[in-house]
């Protein structure tokens, strides 16, 4: 049975949608959340907050697996205020009948304080770090061209990173959070670059004849997988992040695309048409035989992304003229 999207991958859906943004203001973009109820959400009640901070908290928490209910149905009550230039917040556990978090935030702007409180709420209740202070990268159209932009994960504070006046696309973060890898037609050919967003320094990673696209940085930040066509058909290659030590992993006559790494860095998942249709495959990152990842009930799988715990792979598929996001166990199975 197809699963459109769960809370675990909600942010993935948001990022995929950003590439279609047209004509948005430089400091804010639209991010949509889709909830199909595949994962049981944590029921919480929120009170005391107003305006922008209330909207921020609801966005941050709904993306991370919370739903908002009446106080009588809530497992936790999140209460606080955002007056006087600061945010204060607390979490009451109805099962333990006591407060499990109570903090006041100062310094920075209100949005920063709000995201920080949301992170504290997530970690207090789930034990996992929140993602409220993370960034997203995306491409945005400027006339006929596309440029790379960076924004807060909720779409605010968007800033333009490239001004190549060409096609720039496929951004992928390095684990340090300071560097983006992407490809650009800056030199009239799709070449791969690394770009330090703090210093502005940009370096060429792959510039061969033909396509150099789809960079994906390894979890340890030392290697980058990519699609190169310098040997003929588009294949999966791996190199160091400084653009040395290139190694070809796939040698099929079919086109490969969209590499992504397993969280432990041992495997690379990608799309290949080796079987006639776009399907998911994986291959050892140090070289070896490629094997297919079955996606039962879905015959056309594209754009995979491995879950942080390594248990599942999210991917897109097109049905009836629309794209859906599906999830499959990383070993293959029903999608």
Question: Residues of each region from the PLM?
Answer:
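A structural "domain/chain start" motif
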Residues: 22-59
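Amphipathic beta-strand/beta-sheet edge segments enriched in Tyr/Trp
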Residues: 58, 73-120
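Structural motif
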Residues: 86-88, 144-149, 189-193, 233-237, ...
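Residue-level detector of Asp-centered blade-edge/turn motifs that repeat once per structural unit
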Residues: 130-132, 175-176, 219-220, 263-264, ...
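Hydrophobic beta-strand positions that form the internal "hydrophobic ladder"
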Residues: 136, 180-181, 221-225, 265-268, ...
